Amino acid sequence: MLMAELPEPPTPTLSAIYASYEARQGDGFRDHLGASLIGKSCTRALWYDFRWATPARHTGRILRLFETGQLEEARLVRDLRATSATVLEVDPDTGRQFRVEAHGGHFGGSLDGVAVGLLEDPKTWHVVEFKTHSAKSFAELVGKGVALAKPQHAAQMQIYMHLTGITRALYVAVCKDTDALHIERVPADPETGERLLEKARRIIFAQHPPERISSDPAWFECRFCDHHGLCHGEDAAAITCRSCLHSTPVEGGWHCARHDRLLDPADQRRACPRHLFIPDLVPGEVTDAGDDFVAYRMRDGSPWTNDAREEEAAAC
């Protein structure tokens, strides 16, 4: 029997290029719940994101693809300015990207820019959002429009409009395969903006994870989720202050009840020896608990104790 021809292995140089991207990707945790994510259909996945249950990790090829999208933004700004539009990529008052925040700084995002002088409506300021698409995704976008084809992108723009008070958004999409452009003007919908803000509030301040979108681990949204192994399997959550039952989001940061102190982002990433998992993150049933331990009966019937009763170490 003839064997299928195996692909050539990557060259050392190619492997090194991808490895350099992977080395620079950080720890996979975002300090806030992002406006770019709030349109996700699974609220449990968003809660896991916010609680740093699973670090987001990507291959070098995917990270390079993300960078391509970022590099495209400068070209799209140039294209808009060629039409005589005024495009601001940074806030003149701060010299930084325009940024919106809500819920004590736990929710927010950064705008790609704002624009005025557009040919369709020269006097109205617009939130500007740039996105790159595969050929298949681009065709669906052109056929259905952003609200139906890319609800997560639409939600992101609604949040930006709602929190800036700008009444229009300009969605500029480029097909990575053909360089074709698609442009839509999107009106602000205050009701949708408020609903999305409330969704973010529920996720941020929820003590327990919301229901998963599907109990079927093979459901398409579940199969490609960063949290699949934790939500549907036996994977352990990452050990950070955010996965600890002692921590709570408060105005402007996080508070640890065990040590009665505020936690900066570096603290949150380090955790401490008194860390105890939020029980919802453990695949088992609580059988006993105390100040510094929680005992479980795991799904396979075995006992396990999340024990922090060792000699006190430095506060987290």
Question: Over which residues does each language-model region extend?
Answer:
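Internal, hydrophobic cores of structured domains that mediate oligomerization or house catalytic pockets
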Residues: K123-V127, K131, Q152, M161
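A short mid-domain helix/strand-loop element embedded in enzyme catalytic domains
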Residues: F130-S134, C175-K176
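Metal-dependent nuclease catalytic regions and adjoining charged, substrate-binding loops involved
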Residues: E140, K144-A154, I159-H255, D260, ...
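Metal-dependent nuclease catalytic cores that hydrolyze phosphodiester bonds in DNA/RNA
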Residues: M1-V127, S134-K136, A147
